[in-house]
């Protein structure tokens, strides 16, 4: 409570709160289980004596995970016992909402980052189908980023999220037809470079602006695929 233990400040994503107190307290029980029952006694002793440090002992779970955004958008978010289920999204706003719900839910089962790849490629069809303007895309992505930065995971933490952007449609997807709302559309992912550009430009604008106080967003952490056909001269 008086924050004298160094471990209170070990996680920059966790603030002083009731949720943080609960996580820190229960985490010590879990950490002792790891050291006594899972790791070799020599490893447990080495950690306790400061010879080495084993990270994230507070969580009896895997570390990081990557998921299929294409599968989520094709099937909708569901299958989690005791929670609501969604049909496949038909619009950019509902797609972003399901991504937030998915990442927030799965984050509670993992210690580290949750990631989606090809974010711009897989969301571009929604921009095309609804003929969205740049302003509409930017507004939707602003809501998306703000929602991802709500402290909704255990310990009053923000979900640790990572998104990979292709910038240019990958060769293995260029001739494939998206399924939106469970139905195929009459264009391929390779036809959507203009829509991908809108998404990338809007996302960078939102991340660059920060929140209402100008504070930078912690998440999602963006990763860009730098391939041989990367457009270095893009206006974005």
Roles of regions detected by a PLM:
Residues 1-236:
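Conserved catalytic cores of very large enzyme subunits
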């Amino acid at each position: 409570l008086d924050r004298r233990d160094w471990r209170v400040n070990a996680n920059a994503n966790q603030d002083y709160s009731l949720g943080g107190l609960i996580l820190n307290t229960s985490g010590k029980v879990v950490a002792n289980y790891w050291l006594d029952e899972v790791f070799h006694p020599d490893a447990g002793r080495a950690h306790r004596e400061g010879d080495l440090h084993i990270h994230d002992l507070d969580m009896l779970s895997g570390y990081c995970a990557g998921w299929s955004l294409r599968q989520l958008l094709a099937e909708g978010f569901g299958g989690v016992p005791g929670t609501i289920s969604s049909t496949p999204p038909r619009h950019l706003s509902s797609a972003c909402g399901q991504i937030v719900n998915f990442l927030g839910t799965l984050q509670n089962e993992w210690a580290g980052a949750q990631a989606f790849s090809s974010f711009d490629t897989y969301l571009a069809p929604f921009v095309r189908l609804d003929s969205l303007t740049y302003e509409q895309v930017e507004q939707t992505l602003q809501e998306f980023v703000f929602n991802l930065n709500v402290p909704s995971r255990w310990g009053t933490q923000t979900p640790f999220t990572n998104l990979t952007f292709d910038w240019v449609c990958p060769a293995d997807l260029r001739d494939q037809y998206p399924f939106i709302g469970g139905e195929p559309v009459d264009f391929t992912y390779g036809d959507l470079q203009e829509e991908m550009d809108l998404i990338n430009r809007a996302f960078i604008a939102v991340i660059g602006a920060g929140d209402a106080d100008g504070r930078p967003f912690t998440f999602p952490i963006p990763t860009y695929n730098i391939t041989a056909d990367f457009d270095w001269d893009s206006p974005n």
